[in-house]
Amino acid sequence: MSQLDVLILDDEESIRNLIAANLKDEGFNPKVAANSTQALKIISEKPVSAVILDIWLQGSEIDGLGVLEIIKKRYPLIPVIIISGHGTIETAVNAIKMGAYDYIEKPFNNDKLIILLKRACEVTKLKRENIDLKSKVIDKTELVGGCSVTLKYKMEIEKAASSSSRIMIHGKVGSGKELAARLIHKQSKRVNNPFIIFSPTCMTTEKINQELFGESEKQENNNKRPTILEFANNGTLYIDEVSNIPIPIQVKLLKFLKDQTITKPCGKKTKVDIKIITSTSKNIQDEVNNGKFLEDLYYRLNVFSLKVPSLYERKEDIPLLVKYFVKQLSKFSGLKERHFSDEAITALQSYEWPGNIRQLRNVVEWTLIMNPLTTGNNEIIKPYMIPSEILANSANLTKLEDSFDMLSMPLREAREVFERQYLSAQMSRFNNNISKTSSFVGMERSALHRKLKLLSLHIPPTNKINEEEYEKANA
């Protein structure tokens, strides 16, 4: 067995030394601490495999149950074995409820402690393997897609991850800002340390103040509970929709950013090392101009600016995203894995997706739920199975609403109506990219330019690459 680090926290030196000697004989690597401050410092520097914790800890700033609470919140997989010579059944029950692996009384049998410790480490090992297995089955930090916009975005994320600067992620609701933050953390040097998400949107000013800085109107809550900033020490703190933080808290956050020091109400100062990532779906510059966001705070947080592309800009990724969501839902929601027809994919690509990736996932899930697999006849998802609002707002490619009117038209006029609908839909599908549209429909670019002009289809450019082609098409 490879050596496992085990922390022994007890206020009695003789007990610490005795347990440490016994653990060393059994192949463990013991680390000792006399109080909560020493113990939490040891764990923050390098998480241990297990903790043996005395419940009383005389002379310690935080008692055993308080230390247990902190460990289980910061490092939920570390097993904690409680030991005490003055315990009661009520204390033991409370410790187990708070997440302790087990509870034994002093004086204890050394063999029993060793067996308990080995069992706790083995259980934790199995939990970690299970988590690793689940993460391999489906990676929650996977950025699906291979279009040019997505590839460029992936490169920007890599640059952000290698930077030590603070990062602000800009993107529309549902575009995947949290995913971007997770990817940055995953690819950074802090990957093995905490990734903490803080969302202040639905919190009161008092609650935000308490969570970030440990300040509460209830004096008994002050100083005891570790803050979000302490939880994120040595790791990454992701603040979602940072523009929703009230001005008084912005002032405190700005002060914290200057030296990354937390000052508790009691006056105690704690230095932390955190990579801070923030996100917003609002135009922060407008918020600054309107006096809703501190300009200095904006500049300190927006050192590295990352823009998340909307799904509208990534329409070519929709087929891959649909496959990904179908596979995800079949594995974790029990829904049967299905195939979306080319016509259904085309309908999805023709929609503008104001709700972005999140909306697409919801649509895929709704479609699978509302069209259960009953026979082989409905194994393939057809356009009519997709939510009606998606089809109603998609470009008119999968159906011809004017089919009855066209029956009364001469062939030349009917063909013009069809071509206008068809090319309009295809241009929308490929985000107004002339090259990709011409390739798909089987026309030369110059021929497509002429056809668009002939049909009076003036498609505005969506990026600089298309500007020259747009001018040619509308010349």
Swiss-Prot record:
Give residue ranges for domain Response regulatory.
Answer: 5-121
Tell me where in this chain the PTM 4-aspartylphosphate is found: D54
Q: Name one Pfam family in it.
A: HTH_8
Is the Magnesium keyword given for this protein? no
Instruction: Name the UniProt key words of this record, in alphabetical order.
Output: ATP-binding, Nucleotide-binding, Phosphoprotein, Transcription, Transcription regulation, Two-component regulatory system
A GO molecular function for this record? ATP hydrolysis activity
Task: Provide the residue positions that the database annotates as binding ATP.
Answer: 171-178, 232-241
What does the entry give for GO biological process?
phosphorelay signal transduction system; regulation of DNA-templated transcription
* UniProt domain Sigma-54 factor interaction: residue ranges: 143-369
Give a short account of what the protein does: Member of the two-component regulatory system RT0550/RT0603.
Protein name per UniProt: Putative response regulator NtrX-like
